[in-house]
Amino acid sequence: MQFEIRIGPHKQRAPILKDLDLRIQMAEKEKARNTFMGFVNKVWPEFIAGAHHAIMAKAFEKVARGENKRLIINMAPRHTKSEFASYLLPSWFLGRFPDKKIIQCSNTAELAVGFGRKVRNLVGSEQYTKVFPD
């Protein structure tokens, strides 16, 4: 986001712009903590969301809040089902609820282990700890 502020010399603008940038960062961090798509956008900035991603995100948020105990997603291949459900959702969920446990399962052990490693690597990353510092 870029703004143009006209309030005099650079000395006066610099602290205001710094404060504005800090407020934007804090708002983005809060959105990433509280919404699944906010988290996706923070850890995967080049991701381009479609309408089906927003629907999945809302469903995942309901599951995380305990409003929905079961969820089945039927979608064509290559629509980010696995990236969302097996990688990004567990990462976001563990950040929100660090006392909970996740079971990683798939049709092959190799795939489940691979997603588990991706989750572990993301949770240990610098960009993740900026969202969930604890």
Residue ranges and their predicted role:
Residues 2-134:
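Phosphate/NTP-binding elements of NTP-utilizing enzymes
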